[in-house]
Regions:
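Nucleic-acid enzyme cleavage-core boundary/entry regions
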Residues: 1-50, 55-69, 84, 91, ...
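Conserved beta-strand segments of alpha/beta enzyme cores
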Residues: 47, 99-101
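Acidic beta-strand-to-loop metal/phosphate-binding motif
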Residues: 73-82
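RNase H-like polynucleotidyl transferase catalytic core
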Residues: 101-107
Length: 158
């Protein structure tokens, strides 16, 4: 039982398959793309998982095991608001079969942190155009129209 622990805990990928039962006592599982953000994040009633960018099969299987054993949990993903962040989220949804919702990867967040956004490169535009007809259409259209992207490290959660 880890519910009373404060702070981070690391579990080796090598033992994830050996874990038989995972009971999440909070309401949410939140996956995070970047390590800096993971270390600085506290999200009440959430089990937070660091993905390290593109997730591997071991992490995906662990997440699927959590979903199977905790069917009422909400799954969120917090990543960069750029083409890479949305590709990671789309890949996570496809490979796990879980309906992850983007967390703070929206127009409101881009507007709030406008001073920290960066301009899109030509490659960013190409990649975003390929994603524009996905479930993330609203934020991607905004990014293309306003020539902006945002690293998740600029966003304050705590």
């Amino acid at each position: 039982d880890l519910r009373d622990l404060k702070g981070d805990i690391a579990i080796s990928s090598a033992i994830l398959d050996d874990i038989e039962r995972i009971t999440i006592t909070g309401e949410t599982v939140l996956t995070i793309e970047n390590l800096t953000t993971f270390h600085s994040t506290y999200y009440k009633d959430a089990f937070v998982i660091y993905l390290g960018g593109f997730h591997n099969a071991i992490r995906r299987n662990f997440i699927k095991k959590i979903a199977d054993q905790n069917p009422t949990i909400t799954f969120l993903h917090f990543g960069d608001i750029d083409a890479g962040g949305f590709y990671i989220l789309e890949h996570l949804i496809k490979k796990t079969g879980i309906s992850f919702k983007p967390f703070m990867m929206d127009v409101e967040t881009l507007e709030k942190y406008r001073g920290s956004t960066k301009s899109l490169t030509e490659n960013d535009r190409k990649r975003l155009n390929r994603l524009e007809k996905t479930r993330f259409n609203e934020v991607i259209s905004y990014m293309l129209e306003h020539n902006c992207k945002l690293e998740q490290e600029a966003i304050k959660l705590a």
